[in-house]
């Protein structure tokens, strides 16, 4: 797991841009926050990057299992500081897990 501590890191900036529709459309990705939502995304195999708040990766058995499952799928894992998580997250009080998820498009049958 790589450690990110700078809010000016290009990876952090790219993730933070996903708060805006323009960048979500451009990158075909969006942010998911919180243990349950991230867990569902990992189980679906659509997570590109997983950001874990520093000092919380073993906070619970469930969280450790989510991180292990993401690692097994080859997801890019980052341990981030609180200022970095605040920059990435869209909520006022960020969760311990935030993920960049690939946007799936479904074709409608005519």
State where each predicted segment sits.
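Hydrophobic alpha-helical segments and helix pairs
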Residues: 84-110
């Amino acid at each position: 797991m790589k450690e990110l501590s700078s809010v000016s890191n290009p990876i952090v900036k790219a993730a933070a841009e996903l708060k805006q529709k323009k960048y979500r459309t451009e990158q075909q990705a969006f942010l998911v926050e919180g243990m349950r939502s991230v867990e569902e995304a990992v189980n679906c195999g659509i997570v590109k990057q997983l950001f874990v708040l520093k000092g919380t990766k073993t906070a619970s058995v469930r969280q450790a299992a989510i991180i292990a499952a993401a690692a097994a799928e080859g997801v890019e894992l980052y341990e981030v500081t609180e200022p970095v998580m605040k920059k990435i997250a869209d909520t006022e009080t960020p969760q311990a897990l935030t993920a960049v998820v690939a946007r799936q498009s479904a074709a409608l049958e005519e």
